[in-house]
Regions:
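Trp/Phe/Arg-rich N-terminal binding region typifying the photolyase-homology
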Residues: 1-82, 172
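Glycine/tryptophan-enriched, flexible segments
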Residues: 68-208
Length: 214
């Protein structure tokens, strides 16, 4: 269904005055969240990135267009403030328990058509970092961390991964961390230069006429 219709309806159904979610920086998600926020109080929080698109800027306060410069500033900010990857503990004393008198029927995954897959999800393998610098680019070798899909769908926190690798001191760690920085850079580009999602990063190149139409 359409989340702009379903989210407000579900909030009303369960008696929720506010909806809390994590930020998404793709153009579709931004439009979706704006539409939802017009119907229900929507609170969005940074989660999928370490540093938001507006937290890393050049000396003039403008977003970076080149990755290396972005990465250098990103690493310097992390070095000076480890709160970017800090852990947050929930104060359970402030959370009130309230038993709902309204019974809500929620369909199971089986009821809505999902079937159990025989595919096994691989664990995230941080042990590969020791040889990551030398072996990461060889498809025949099983030497990737397998973290990509977990990060993409929010199954694991990018902060927890960085906290785990910070004590490591080798070239593999530097490259793997650089690839996580690239994720933030990618989202920064999406947020600051939304035209790049479907057009050339530099708009003037959209006018190039390709002889083979590709």
């Amino acid at each position: 269904g359409d989340p702009t219709d379903l989210i407000p309806k579900i909030a009303k159904l369960v008696g929720a005055n506010d909806v809390f979610a994590n930020e998404d920086y793709e153009s579709y998600a931004i439009k979706r969240d704006k539409a939802v926020s017009k119907q229900v109080k929507l609170h969005l929080y940074k989660d999928t990135v370490i540093m938001r698109y507006d937290e890393v800027a050049n000396g003039k306060g403008l977003p970076y267009r080149v990755f290396t410069a972005y990465k250098n500033t990103w690493l310097a900010k992390l070095e000076s403030d480890y709160r970017f990857i800090g852990e947050y503990k929930i104060n359970k004393k402030k959370i009130k328990e309230q038993e709902s008198t309204k019974k809500i029927e929620i369909s199971s995954l089986k009821d809505i058509g999902f079937i159990e897959s025989e595919a096994k999800i691989n664990k995230i393998e941080l042990s590969v970092i020791d040889e990551y610098a030398e072996k990461r680019d060889f498809p025949a070798l099983d030497n990737t961390s397998k973290a990509s899909v977990y990060l993409r769908f929010g199954f694991v926190s990018v902060r927890s991964l960085i906290r785990k690798i910070m004590p490591i001191d080798n070239e593999g760690k530097k490259i793997w961390l650089s690839e996580l920085v690239w994720r933030d850079f990618y989202f920064s580009i999406l947020a600051n230069f939304p035209h790049a999602e479907k057009n050339c990063y530099r708009p003037e190149f959209d006018l190039i006429e390709w002889s083979d139409d590709k």
